[in-house]
């Protein structure tokens, strides 16, 4: 449904007021149309008699049925239609994994691809699709002949393919600006599907912090050692979501990991702050690891590069013997399962089947 309102410049405030009043109604109309199309397509496959299908269509578009939709919403409306026909519409479900992305093909499949495969194994009844949020990476991949969708492109594709239930699972570490944009984009598409919801990144709720610390320890990313420190490099942004990193470091101390420190490329703690903490102790060795899903450009260049401005070089300039781990978080099966756990929580309210 499209709408155009104009007063030819005579009363633009009136045009705006009319639009403000009509847009919610049009949004409801779009959702109603989606419901009707879903029911009609289901009945075409399950009810051979055309006359019976036409009768049902008249019933679900009658004034009392439309009033039910307006007053009680789509769930009550679909239940009413199911009672009339005796048939529950078949939902078509997709999981959309949303990542910042990386242009490094091998790394991409070892990390992002590995998370997606773990999700597909846990939820075999759903189809798994991919979207990247970095426009620079999307552009570069397309130039190299690899197609990947943005979030809006992916949701448009899923709509055209007839999916009715969408679960978006981000693979971010923290809820920064990319996650905020994902939520904004997804909100625009809610009326295009019967159900659309967005999961949470690795660090979102209080329980996520000790869980991730335990998972990293079990995966060998960090360890209690008296003479060796561990420095984790996160991305970080100027967004409030970057507060997850100092909170994570606080949890490290609470869990007894006094030798594990966190720094970020674009937020807090900075590398300088992490160095200041390191110098308070007598460590001579530092294990440098990415606190990033994928070991892309930031790991290869900013963290482990041989140039003097890399984290590895700066640590060596400060007298530390540095061991570099370049494997992104997504390559560890236990980390993959943390994303699966978040998605499981998101899908639980829909009673969606899974394989344990």
What are these regions (language model features)?
Residues 1-5:
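Rossmann-fold NAD(P)-binding glycine/threonine-rich loop
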């Amino acid at each position: 449904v499209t709408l155009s309102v104009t007063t030819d410049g005579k009363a633009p405030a009136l045009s705006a007021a009319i639009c403000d009043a009509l847009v919610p109604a049009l949004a409801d109309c779009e959702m109603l149309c989606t419901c009707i199309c879903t029911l009609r397509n289901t009945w075409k496959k399950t009810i051979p008699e055309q006359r019976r299908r036409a009768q049902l269509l008249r019933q679900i578009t009658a004034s009392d049925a439309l009033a039910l939709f307006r007053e009680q919403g789509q769930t009550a409306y679909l239940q009413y239609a199911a009672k009339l026909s005796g048939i529950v519409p078949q939902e078509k479900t997709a999981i959309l994994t949303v990542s910042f992305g990386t242009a490094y093909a091998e790394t991409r499949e070892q990390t992002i691809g590995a998370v997606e495969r773990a999700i597909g194994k846990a939820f075999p009844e759903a189809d798994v699709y991919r979207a990247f949020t970095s426009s620079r990476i999307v552009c570069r991949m397309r130039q190299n002949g690899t197609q990947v969708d943005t979030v809006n492109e992916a949701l448009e594709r899923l709509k055209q393919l007839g999916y009715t239930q969408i679960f978006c699972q981000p693979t971010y570490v923290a809820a920064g600006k990319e996650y905020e944009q994902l939520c904004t984009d997804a909100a625009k598409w809610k009326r295009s599907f019967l159900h659309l919801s967005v999961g949470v990144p690795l660090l979102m709720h209080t329980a996520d912090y000790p869980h991730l610390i335990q998972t990293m320890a079990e995966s060998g990313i960090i360890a209690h050692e008296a003479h060796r420190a561990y420095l984790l490099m996160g991305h970080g942004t100027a967004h409030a979501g970057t507060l997850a990193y100092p909170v994570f470091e606080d949890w490290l101390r609470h869990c007894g990991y006094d030798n594990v420190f966190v720094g970020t490329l674009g937020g807090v703690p900075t590398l300088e702050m992490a160095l200041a903490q390191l110098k308070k102790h007598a460590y001579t060795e530092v294990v440098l690891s990415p606190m990033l899903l994928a070991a892309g450009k930031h790991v290869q260049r900013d963290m482990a590069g041989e140039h003097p401005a890399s984290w590895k070089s700066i640590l060596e300039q400060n007298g530390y013997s540095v061991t570099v781990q370049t494997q992104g978080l997504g390559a560890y099966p236990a980390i993959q399962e943390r994303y699966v756990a978040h998605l499981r929580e998101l899908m639980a309210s829909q009673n969606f089947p899974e394989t344990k």
